[in-house]
Amino acid sequence: MAHESHESKAPAGAGEAEAVEVTVVLPAHNEAERIECAVEETERALSSFCRRYEIIIAEDGSTDNTAEIARKIAEKRKNVRFMHSDERLGRGRALNRAFKKARGEVLAYIDVDLSTDMRHLRELIDAIRVEKYDFATGSRLLKASHTQRSLKREAMSRLYNFLVRLLLRSKLRDHQCGFKAFSRDALFSILDEVEDKHWFWDTELLVKAQWRGFSVKEIPVHWEERSGGTKVKLLKDSISMLSNVLKMWLNERCGERGKGKGF
């Protein structure tokens, strides 16, 4: 059963608690070794340009001691909240659940491995907060991006994103970078249409956002593959995601575009 085990108290009264500028969600499944560092780095980056923020650790059915560590972090840090699920929800469902509990006007999520350089966080948030884009995403595949990862993963990523552009008519270069931000209103207007529960969530969200006419900014980032970092199983998850691209394309061809059906 999924439940929220801990939620840190707001630093002041209810009125101020509602006036959160930015919420950053950290999805965490078996991240005991990295979650504390991820929270520290995220809070350091956020506090340098934002006064009213919160960080939500969306712990997702971990079998190590991620939940215990995350609970202690939330108890010690006033701007950190902790959500726990006894069962594995999948990355997409865990993000959906956390965003629906978030208080920020700008909502974002960052992969806990911090492969994306945190110096880009302000640019990501300001794309929504200042430039008024509806969605913003880091990109490892723009000319100005700097990416370090294996040739196999680079080739698979380029092929995958090419097929998404070709079949689903996306204008973006990179759909899967775990470094995204959203306008609260824009995200909530489309969130229930996104049905994938795991890795394809990002692609489905960004493609449907474009189909709905939302503005999306793609930001070149410095990105470095971390040792033991990714939870993606290259062959299995690649086949699954390519299958989802084909399903989405077939549904769109059958007149289902924008209706959130067929997944």
What feature does the model see in each segment?
Residues 1-21, 165-170, 193-263:
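Hydrophobic helical membrane-anchoring modules
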Residues 1-44, 51:
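N-proximal low-complexity "stem/linker" segments adjacent to membrane-targeting elements
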Residues 26, 51-62, 83-85:
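Short beta-strand/loop segment that forms part of the nucleotide-sugar
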Residues 31-34, 62, 91, 117:
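Donor nucleotide-sugar binding loop of glycosyltransferases
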Residues 38, 66, 95, 119-121, ...:
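Acidic donor-diphosphate engagement hotspot in glycosyltransferases and nucleotidyltransferases
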Residues 59-67, 114:
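A conserved acidic beta->alpha catalytic loop
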Residues 79-101, 106, 115-199, 225-243, ...:
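Acceptor/aglycone-binding surface of glycosyltransferases and processive sugar-polymer synthases
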